[in-house]
């Protein structure tokens, strides 16, 4: 049930190198990737896109943002993605629907509250199978195996993942010295997964061993990040 956010819903991806556990909790020592979602903008922007490709690939995107009122105290943003395509292997498909609305309230120049919503459904996903080396990169007396060879079981395999999230971001500057930042997020991921996959060829080079994997998962994540910032000066030294 690992979360996976469609890249179109992201503003940017930051690479944080080295240990970051002091700031962000348990994480690999080599660093981590910070995915930053799209936020409402004070400048109006409207984008609609459609793309077509091989394997009956069709993907539609939409991104709308701007102020709601004339004073710019209320801002909004709405991003959406829809995807349908055939997978690399025969009988497999990919499908996705994702929505990301957000709303910002700025009552004054020193206060800002942003609310985020996120929903993504992947009712189908490409097979995680593969092809054996004999017949692809190594010789096989029975010939080559097609690159779209499907090693699964159509009546059994399935993948269905749903993700939803609600988050907030509050900033308040009291004066030139003190400010606070309050952030919180709830994320739920549900995934149902059944798979049959290749597990090597028998010595006769024509019988395929297969394995089975099945999973029913649900995960809830709660994250809080509260910060107080003060800027002080002691003689020639500035402190934050």
Give a label for each model feature.
Residues 166-189, 212-240:
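Face-selective signature of the C-terminal outer-membrane beta-barrel domain
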Residues 8-11, 22-99, 107-111, 164:
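Outer-membrane beta-barrel translocator/receptor signature
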Residues 16, 61-67, 79, 102-106, ...:
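Transmembrane beta-barrel domains of outer membrane proteins
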